[in-house]
């Protein structure tokens, strides 16, 4: 559910996290999920099939995008798209100058115009079965365009637990990798993107 607080903006749930007021109702869980799936799919995976034009950096005109969504969902309003983006705690999307894009998770080929990460170390969670292969061959993207790295050990554990019960966390020597010419782009406060990470920069974090 998405609602809007007059003082603190859009939020998800029954009450504003800051002032605890209920705010104005906008979207129920069902509509929120439908919009979220379509926005994610279009901006990350199938813009052409959805009928929108995406530039090389992943941007889509927000008015054109809303027109496409209205054809699919008659109840769609432009405000709902802003509400979906601004209430998203994971920072999956950004809106700028009447354009919208996904910040990470792409399978379509886009260029990254983010700033370089300044974290000396980054982290990647893997299953015990994957670790030896990664240490030998490095980390490559599988279903996505870029490798997704975490800026903290804790976040890497959180992400890895989605896929495995006993994650092994790899530490990446980001400073050395960047010195050697590997680009590490900061997508959000928690996520850094890379084309690949060669094995010489990987180390297992001992518990």
Swiss-Prot record:
Any Pfam family hit: PTS_2-RNA
Enzyme's top EC category: transferase
Enzyme Commission designation: 2.7.1.-
GO biological process: tRNA splicing, via endonucleolytic cleavage and ligation
Entries under InterPro entries matching the protein: Ptrans_KptA/Tpt1, RNA_2'-PTrans_C, RNA_2'-PTrans_KptA, RNA_2'-PTrans_N
Keywords for this protein: NAD, Transferase
Positions of transmembrane segments: none
Molecular-function annotations in GO: NAD+ poly-ADP-ribosyltransferase activity; tRNA 2'-phosphotransferase activity
Family: Belongs to the KptA/TPT1 family.
Function field: Removes the 2'-phosphate from RNA via an intermediate in which the phosphate is ADP-ribosylated by NAD followed by a presumed transesterification to release the RNA and generate ADP-ribose 1''-2''-cyclic phosphate (APPR>P). May function as an ADP-ribosylase.
Descriptive protein name: Probable RNA 2'-phosphotransferase
Native source organism of the sequence: Methanosarcina barkeri (strain Fusaro / DSM 804)
């Amino acid at each position: 559910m998405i609602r809007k607080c007059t003082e603190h903006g859009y939020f998800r749930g029954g009450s504003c996290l800051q002032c605890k007021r209920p705010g104005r109702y906008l979207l129920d869980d069902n509509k929120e999920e439908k919009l979220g799936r379509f926005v994610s799919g279009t901006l990350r995976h199938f813009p052409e099939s959805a009928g929108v034009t995406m530039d090389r950096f992943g941007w889509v005109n927000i008015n054109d995008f809303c027109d496409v969504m209205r054809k699919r969902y008659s109840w769609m309003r432009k405000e709902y798209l802003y509400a979906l983006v601004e209430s998203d705690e994971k920072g999956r999307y950004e809106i700028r100058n009447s354009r919208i894009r996904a910040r990470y998770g792409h399978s379509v080929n886009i260029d990254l115009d983010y700033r370089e990460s300044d974290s000396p170390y980054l982290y990647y969670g893997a299953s015990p079965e994957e670790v030896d292969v990664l240490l030998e061959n490095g980390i490559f993207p599988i279903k996505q365009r870029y490798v997704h790295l975490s800026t903290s050990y804790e976040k890497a554990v959180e992400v890895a637990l989605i896929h495995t019960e006993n994650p092994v966390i790899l530490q990446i020597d980001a400073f050395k990798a960047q010195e050697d010419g590997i680009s590490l782009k900061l997508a959000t406060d928690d996520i850094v993107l890379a084309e690949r990470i060669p094995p010489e920069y990987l180390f297992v974090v001992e518990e």
